């Protein structure tokens, strides 16, 4: 249940962002919409760096602690609040003008000043998931995420749609929603963690958390920066209209983490146990089995989205954003490499240094490859740059090191044959559905997309059920075990 709540909260957050994007794409013109998205991009890009891995450190410091639980939490929140406050000061004292100049968008000067309070409000709330999961309050986490995201959607949509407040109003509503998130988060965290007599936050405790969090959090920070550099490059090198189109297509598909996070968390404890007992053959079999189960669920969904991408972008964001289908389709090419988190093997082998090295290489290469591609191809180049780096560096890097850790050959690490069969089925179903769609006289993008998706699923589901029924049923049974509470430890990381 912990894992599903963790994944579910991420899915709810992603759906909330999707709802806001869908409304603002229709209410604002592309220039105003780009201003809103660029304002949020500043925190989305810098936020992981500011956090220093401190929220994840609570998974280590809270379990087993009896005498200083509340103090450990307060030390973590003080550090997060201080780091968020420093960035808020940076924005308020001239950083807004500097960023507006780099993005060639003078309107950012006003919106970033309005947004300046947001980092100090929101950064402490990044600890909510860790605290509530460790303390066994998973229902609280889901309710908190659902309520605060609904509040944010209501505030932003109300400001933009009903009040016609423009991007400054939408950003102001986002900042106000930060107060709601902080209030709810602090209330729940303090309720979940009991107070002790005679125990207070100390500088020594803060220092201990920093020493633990920074090395582990550094890899996570760099990987998030690496995967977000595409939007920064498009903001700097392309027009605001192009950034608006790109940002909608470059969205994180909500279902990806909702599928892969539970699957990885199901596998990770057993994978660690097998690795520690030096049973690497069984660990490899477990790994391949998990990859097959996720592939049967994830790849068909991605295939359907690939085929109906233009209709999906039109339905979500209006006809003005039909070209957002280009970046979406390019990023969907990453799905076969994201069937599982390779970091699970690195964690099982206690080789987090490999995650850090991968992150550094990904960040540097993404900048080096994407910059000229964006200059030459426009915003499409950013998507292709990320895909080239992922398939040309990240995937081979993971295959090489994971095969060594499991003492096998790279071509035995993944279920390539099964993945290939699924991709062939998707390609055949997609081609037939696209051919049939050409003969349908449907005037609505929604009807056209729905009809195409339905045809693809009708063509896909029977052969998938016939060939991979065991994997599908096994995946469902594993999730049912999680729902029954038979799990240990925190949710798996990336």
Which residues make up each language-model segment?
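Interfacial/gating helices of multi-pass transporter permease domains
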Residues: 23-45, 109-110, 167-171, 205-216, ...
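Interhelical loop/hinge segments that connect adjacent transmembrane helices in multipass membrane
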Residues: 139, 167-171, 185-227, 266, ...
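Membrane-interface junctions at transmembrane-helix termini in multi-pass inner-membrane proteins
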Residues: 61, 121-144, 332-361, 372
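Helix-loop junctions and terminal segments of transmembrane helices
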Residues: 17, 22, 50-66, 133-134, ...
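Hydrophobic alpha-helical transmembrane segments
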Residues: 109, 113, 142-192, 212, ...
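Signature of the first transmembrane helix
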Residues: 1-56, 83-88, 92-93, 153, ...
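Membrane-proximal transmembrane or re-entrant/amphipathic helices at the cytosolic face
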Residues: 409, 432-494
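N-terminal membrane topogenesis motif
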Residues: 1-17, 70, 74, 108, ...
């Amino acid at each position: 249940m912990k894992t599903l709540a963790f994944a579910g909260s991420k899915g709810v957050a992603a759906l909330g962002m999707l709802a806001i994007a869908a409304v603002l794409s229709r209410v604002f013109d592309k220039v105003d919409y780009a201003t809103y998205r660029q304002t949020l991009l500043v925190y989305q890009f810098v936020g992981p760096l500011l956090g220093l891995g401190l929220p994840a450190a609570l998974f280590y410091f809270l379990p087993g602690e009896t005498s200083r639980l509340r103090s450990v939490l307060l030390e973590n929140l003080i550090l997060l609040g201080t780091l968020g406050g420093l960035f808020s000061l940076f924005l308020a004292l001239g950083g807004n003008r500097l960023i507006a100049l780099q993005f060639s968008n003078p309107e950012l000067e006003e919106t970033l000043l309005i947004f300046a309070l947001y980092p100090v409000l929101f950064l402490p709330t990044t600890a909510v998931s860790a605290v509530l999961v460790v303390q066994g309050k998973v229902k609280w986490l889901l309710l908190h995420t659902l309520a605060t995201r609904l509040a944010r959607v209501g505030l932003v949509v109300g400001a933009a749609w009903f009040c016609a407040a423009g991007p400054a109003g939408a950003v102001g509503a986002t900042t106000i929603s930060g107060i709601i998130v902080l209030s709810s988060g602090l209330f729940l965290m303090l309720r979940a963690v009991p107070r002790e007599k005679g125990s207070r936050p100390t500088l020594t405790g803060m220092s201990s958390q920093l020493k633990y969090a920074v090395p582990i959090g550094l890899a996570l920070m760099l990987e998030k920066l690496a995967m977000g550099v595409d939007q920064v490059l498009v903001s700097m090198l392309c027009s605001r209209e192009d950034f608006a189109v790109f940002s909608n297509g470059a969205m994180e598909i909500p279902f990806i983490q909702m599928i892969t996070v539970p699957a990885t968390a199901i596998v990770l404890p057993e994978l660690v146990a097998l690795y520690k007992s030096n049973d690497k053959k069984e660990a490899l079999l477990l790994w391949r089995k998990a990859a097959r189960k996720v592939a049967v669920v994830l790849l068909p969904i991605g295939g359907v989205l690939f085929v109906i991408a233009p209709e999906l972008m039109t339905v979500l964001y209006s006809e003005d954003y039909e070209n957002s289908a280009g970046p979406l389709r390019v990023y969907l090419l990453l799905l076969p490499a994201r069937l599982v988190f390779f970091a699970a093997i690195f964690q099982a082998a206690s080789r987090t240094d490999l995650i850090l090295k991968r992150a550094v290489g990904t960040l540097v290469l993404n900048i080096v490859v994407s910059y000229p591609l964006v200059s030459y191809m426009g915003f499409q180049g950013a998507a292709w740059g990320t895909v080239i780096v992922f398939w040309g560096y990240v995937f081979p890097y993971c295959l090489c090191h994971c095969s060594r850790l499991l003492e096998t050959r790279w071509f035995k690490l993944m279920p390539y044959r099964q993945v290939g069969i699924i991709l062939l089925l998707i390609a055949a179903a997609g081609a037939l559905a696209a051919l049939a769609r050409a003969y349908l006289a449907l005037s609505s993008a929604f009807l056209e997309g729905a009809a195409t998706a339905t045809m693809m699923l009708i063509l896909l589901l029977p052969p998938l059920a016939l060939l991979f029924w065991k994997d599908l049923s096994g995946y469902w049974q594993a999730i049912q075990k999680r729902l029954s509470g038979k799990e240990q430890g925190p949710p798996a990381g990336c």
